[in-house]
Design a protein with these regions (language model features):
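Transmembrane alpha-helices and adjacent helix-loop boundaries
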Residues: 2-371
């Protein structure tokens, strides 16, 4: 008598409509067909209404003004208006990621501090900020803080000629001159030499079993080579522009010079940094706690200081836990920047809404946003 007990015979006897692998492929095929059907149906309805699908409107005159970002006038095209929105979003997201990471790292470490007061302050900040909607925080920062600051005539002046008023913040700024192009190779050379020295230093110290970081080896070439180039070339490659309050003949007071951060940009950046920093602090705290306690005890037995333990042992091992959720927080910060429309900051979403209303190109504008 033949016995059918083999595993291979059992698999060959399973009907295809019950095979999990076949069902997965069929489900994907059905999904693709449904998506294509929806796209084709939407496109046919779109064309059936006499509408045309084209991005040629981007070359048309925008006929509206944008007060935030790079230079723009109503005679510029929709394409440049969209570029203004993209650059504004990149500005606030890039700076927000840098400052929120620093704030989150410091707060996360402070949350685990042995100092009772520091730990409680960090915990209070995290709990309050995480449980308050970001839009509420933006409204508070913009309407109750920024707009309540003194006007330009009575602006708060901080050391270094930093002006703070209800129109925003004005900072001193370095601006390149015609000699900057001759100085640029020295900057690039300094960066290359610093990276090479750091790699060589790190490999050598790792072979000896010593700490692998030395700020001196990075700082010397980064400072000496650009300074040498500054002395060799003719003219200053960069000039420091200091802001100052001036009164125009029409009686209007304004601040000239430096770089200006508008009140909307300041409120949005501050809100995103404070809000996202609280979440990053919890990510950092979870990553530090994931490192076994024995690592810290062994480092103390070897005579490491608390700073060395954190920098050389705890944080490098905690990165495997920190990085995945940290990237999610970066994406959340970028997406949350669309709330800028609540305080009239001209980010990508706000500019796109204006383009949509002016041109009537709904599908094209949303495709640009998605891209």
């Amino acid at each position: 008598m033949r016995r059918h007990t083999g595993v291979g015979e059992h698999k060959r006897g399973v009907p295809f409509w019950r095979d999990v692998r076949v069902l997965k492929v069929l489900a994907q095929i059905v999904f693709v067909i449904l998506v294509l059907a929806v796209v084709i149906g939407a496109l046919s309805n779109y064309l059936g209404r006499g509408l045309t699908f084209s991005f040629s409107f981007l070359n048309e005159e925008a006929s509206f003004d944008l007060a935030e970002g790079i230079e723009f006038s109503p005679t510029d095209t929709y394409a440049r208006a969209f570029l203004v929105g993209v650059i504004n979003t990149i500005r606030v997201a890039g700076l927000g990621i840098i400052f929120a990471t620093f704030l989150g790292l410091v707060t996360g470490v402070a949350r685990l501090s042995d100092n009772w007061l520091v730990s409680k302050i960090a915990g209070f900040y995290i709990e309050i900020i995480r449980n308050t909607p970001l839009l509420v925080q933006l409204f508070f920062l913009y309407f109750a803080v920024i707009l309540k600051l003194p006007n330009i005539r009575d602006a708060i002046v901080l050391p270094g000629r930093i002006f703070i008023s209800n129109r925003g913040i004005v900072l001193p700024w370095l601006r390149p001159t015609v000699s900057f192009g001759r100085w640029l190779p020295f900057l690039i050379s300094a960066l290359i030499v610093a990276v090479m020295l750091l790699i060589v230093r790190k490999r050598g110290l790792l072979r000896k079993g010593h700490p692998s970081f030395s700020l001196l080896w990075v700082g010397v070439p980064l400072l000496s080579i650009p300074l040498l180039g500054w002395l060799l070339i003719s003219g200053n490659p960069m000039l420091l522009h200091l802001p100052e309050i001036v009164a125009t003949p029409g009686g209007v007071t304004k601040i000239e010079g430096g770089v200006s951060l508008s009140s909307e940009f300041t409120a949005l950046l501050l809100g995103l940094v404070v809000y996202t920093g609280a979440y990053i602090a919890e990510v950092v705290r979870a990553g530090i706690l994931s490192v076994p306690l024995g690592q810290t005890e062994a480092a103390r037995a070897q005579g490491f200081t608390k700073g060395q333990i954190l920098r050389l042992i705890i944080l490098p091992q905690a990165l495997r836990v920190i990085i995945p959720p940290l990237i999610s927080q970066y994406l959340n910060l970028t997406k949350n920047s669309s709330l800028a429309i609540g305080i009239a900051f001209l980010d990508l979403y706000a500019v796109s809404q204006t383009m949509l209303n002016q041109s009537g190109r709904v599908v094209e504008v949303f495709l640009l946003i998605m891209a």
